[in-house]
Amino acid sequence: MANVNGSFVSPSADATISPQLFYNVDSLSAVLNGFTFWKALATLFFAAVIYDQLRYFYLKGSLVGPTFKLPFMGPFLQSVNPKFHEYKAKWDSGELSCVSVFHKFVVIASTRDMSRKIFNSPAYVKPCVVDIAHKLLGPDNWVFLDGKEHVEFRKGLNGLFTRSALSSYLPVMEECYNKYYKYFLEKSKANDYKPEPWMPEFRELMCAVSCRTFVGHYMTDAAIKKIADDYYMITAALELVNFPFILPFTKAWYGKKASDMVLEEFSNCAAKSKAHMAAGGEITCIMDAWVKAQQDSAKYNEKIAKGLPVEDSEKPSHLLREFTDYEIAQTVFTLLFASQDATSAACTWLFQLVADRPDVLEKIREENLRVRNGNINAPLTMDLLDEMKYTRAVVRETLRYRPPVIMVPYLVKKDFPITDSITVSKGSMIIPSVWPATHDPEAYPNPDSFDPDRWITGDAEKQAKNFLVFGTGPHYCLGQTYAQLNLIAMIGKASLEMDWEHAPTPKSEDIKVFATIFPEV
């Protein structure tokens, strides 16, 4: 037992003790009286600043990035109006770099291999969208599925992009080219063929092609025009840095109104498609193909349920449940969401790049005339598109030289040991980059030169690991073949119907970042 060397005897009375005790209480009271609301607020603010910095230091670890974070907001202002050269500086700073905006910690991968690792790590990451996306696309939209559910849903869409399916969409695609090229010529003539901006027209053309391909003629020309005009607001609402709430007259508010309009139009189209296909109509668009697959699955399941004999040939390649009009609209909306900005950017660059290189435009024109045997009105077919080797090379080089989507945000689902020494924390955003891979001099010599021949006489086709334009892994772009065929057909048809020139400005080669990349002016 421990010995206690002490006494329980009360200390002797000491007249000096009591006044000292009262003096301390008075001091505490004075401090509390001086501790105003504003002082308390300032104390909390400085404590929050310190916490924010310490959290940033912890998450940053050995990653390349700013030594300190601007309290709370980080580089928010730069994120609101992103500049391409700022992204380029990040890529050049290291294989992995970081930044923190408000509560979001962001890791940016700059090399091909690091980007591919992220794309191919579904156990650790999933595609990341801004908070408002759930309100615009619908909280139960398939794009928010993950893992097995996502894989199974995609299987039901794969049949919409087979060679035979794509062939059935060509007539409505060519119809759009013919209509809009006639309009382009009339518009240019009305302006006395003077230089003018054409990006809005290219956006509308691509929107029209997408809508006609997705929903055929179930939608009016006026509705397509409305979607083309308003889709810009959806893009603005889905920028990475934006308000997570829908407040009146904000980008999110305007974007929600536009998305509701698109979903209503697509829902009406779905009802019409169901009636058309149930009556034995032919497939003319993606919606028709998907509705028919659903109806075929329903017929097969009904026979099985009744115990009727069914030939193996009658079983659909992938059994689908029946989707409501709204569910079909949501899915088709995601196809528009995935394609509109990217194809608009590619279309704009394509027209500008070939205009700046008349020899390239002339080769495209010669090839398209030759494969049509001199008949510029020969209808598009898959076989015809297959013969356009040079036109395809121009499209592939455009996508490499100016990849529409330069980065793809992912959310870290659980701590991600991306290297032996770096683990990205759960909840962080991690971004594989496309641009550095498509401008890697080891894969593409003189990467900053536009050279379509690298896809014919060079070995660019062998650099598949670097061509990350459509992603890779479980979330690769479903419509990558369709997107490229669309661009090949579009520029080929344009070369036969029109001639065009580009009046360069000092900023023509500068890059504007708005969801995708466009020429600055």
UniProtKB/Swiss-Prot annotation:
Pfam families: p450 (PF00067). Coiled coil: none annotated. Its EC number is 1.14.19.41. It catalyses: 5-dehydroepisterol + NADPH + O2 + H(+) = ergosta-5,7,22,24(28)-tetraen-3beta-ol + NADP(+) + 2 H2O. It is a single-pass membrane protein. InterPro entries: Cyt_P450, Cyt_P450_CS, Cyt_P450_E_grp-I, Cyt_P450_sf. The chain crosses the membrane at residues 30-50. One of its GO terms (molecular function) is iron ion binding. It is found in: Endoplasmic reticulum membrane. GO terms for biological process: ergosterol biosynthetic process. Keywords: Endoplasmic reticulum, Heme, Iron, Lipid biosynthesis, Lipid metabolism, Membrane, Metal-binding, Monooxygenase, Oxidoreductase, Steroid biosynthesis, Steroid metabolism, Sterol biosynthesis, Sterol metabolism, Transmembrane, Transmembrane helix. Its cofactor is heme. GO terms for cellular component: endoplasmic reticulum membrane. Pathway: Steroid metabolism; ergosterol biosynthesis. The third module or late pathway involves the ergosterol synthesis itself through consecutive reactions that mainly occur in the endoplasmic reticulum (ER) membrane. Firstly, the squalene synthase erg9 catalyzes the condensation of 2 farnesyl pyrophosphate moieties to form squalene, which is the precursor of all steroids. Belongs to the cytochrome P450 family. In Aspergillus, the biosynthesis pathway of the sterol precursors leading to the prevalent sterol ergosterol differs from yeast. The ring system of lanosterol in S.cerevisiae is firstly demethylised in three enzymatic steps leading to the intermediate zymosterol and secondly a methyl group is added to zymosterol by the sterol 24-C-methyltransferase to form fecosterol. In Aspergillus, lanosterol is firstly transmethylated by the sterol 24-C-methyltransferase leading to the intermediate eburicol and secondly demethylated in three steps to form fecosterol. This is C-22 sterol desaturase erg5.
